[in-house]
């Protein structure tokens, strides 16, 4: 008998429907803080609308799982740690597949349609399902329904200071986590919201102006910092390793180029979703300062950002 798990992610209601809710709940480490509405800096947002029903169809015979038709347009292929991924589309209908690493190559297939909250997930036996692959599939599905609603996950590490957020951007290995650790060690009152994939959402502030807010999410990489809270964004800072500490406020064109690479690559490969993401970025750079920090991995770099953004 199908049962439902309900979560609240970035102010939206998400339902997971399956025949194995107890097992599913144990697999989804990081999701438990999201069974309630997010804590906010001041007033709670309006009642969370339902944007996704993720229905898991467990197949005891993985060979019976239908793969996407070959005539569908290939959007993107890429590898993750535990599998190989592909996304195809035909009109408004999209199909996302993960082939799990190892013997048997167990598939996980998502069927989605623009404008629909229903996501059908077909997978092999639950006891053989890789939890990391399931979490990644949920991340893809959430992006699919959230991006058209001015909401996107950004590859970044987020510090909260004085009830506002700074998102540190950069390619993997640039030193985002290293820099945020320097904040935690040397700047009193700072704390980490998320260390890999926070969710940025364009919302109206108290002055009725559209501005970015950031939410913690169930997806936080190896740091596993899963905090269900929401804060206004003070700034975005793109990191660059450098033999000295220097911070520069970017022009709107430079700011666009700083934010774009931190958006989900699978969606940037698709014309429709790229357009939606570009609209989100445009709304961000109209109201929010974006900086480039060229820096050493030292506490003076963190202090430089604090003084620039907050003082």
PLM regions with names:
Residues 1-167, 171-172, 182-191, 199-311:
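A noncatalytic interaction/capping subdomain that flanks phosphate/NTP-handling catalytic cores
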Residues 175:
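Conserved glycine(s) of the Walker
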Residues 179:
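Hydrophobic positions on the alpha1 helix immediately C-terminal to the Walker A/P-loop
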């Amino acid at each position: 008998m199908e049962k439902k798990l309900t979560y609240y992610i970035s102010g939206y209601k998400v339902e997971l429907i399956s025949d194995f809710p107890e097992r599913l709940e144990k697999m989804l480490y990081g999701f438990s803080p999201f069974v309630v509405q997010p804590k906010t800096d001041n007033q709670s947002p309006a009642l969370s609308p339902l944007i996704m029903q993720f229905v898991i169809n467990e197949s005891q015979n993985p060979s019976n799982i239908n793969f996407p038709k070959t005539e569908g347009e290939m959007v993107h292929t890429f590898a993750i740690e535990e599998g190989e991924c592909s996304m195809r589309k035909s009109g408004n209908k999209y199909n996302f597949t993960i082939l799990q690493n190892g013997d048997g190559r167990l598939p996980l297939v998502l069927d989605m349609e623009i404008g629909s909250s229903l996501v059908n997930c077909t997978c092999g036996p639950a006891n053989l399902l890789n939890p990391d692959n399931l979490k990644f599939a949920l991340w893809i599905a959430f992006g699919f329904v959230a991006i058209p609603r001015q909401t996107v996950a950004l590859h970044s590490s987020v510090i909260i200071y004085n009830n506002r957020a700074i998102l540190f951007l950069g390619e993997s290995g640039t030193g985002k986590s290293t820099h945020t650790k320097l904040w935690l060690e040397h700047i009193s009152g700072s704390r980490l919201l998320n260390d890999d994939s926070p969710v940025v959402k364009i919302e109206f502030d108290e002055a009725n102006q559209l501005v970015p807010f950031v939410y913690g999410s169930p997806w936080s990489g190896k740091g596993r910092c899963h905090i269900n809270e929401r804060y206004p964004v003070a700034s975005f800072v793109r990191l660059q390793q450098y033999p000295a500490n220097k911070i520069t406020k970017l022009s709107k064109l430079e700011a666009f180029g700083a934010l774009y690479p931190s958006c989900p690559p699978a969606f940037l490969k698709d014309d429709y979703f790229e357009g939606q993401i570009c609209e989100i970025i445009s709304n961000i750079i109209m109201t929010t300062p974006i900086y480039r920090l060229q820096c050493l991995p030292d506490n003076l770099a963190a202090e430089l950002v604090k003084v620039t953004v907050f003082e």
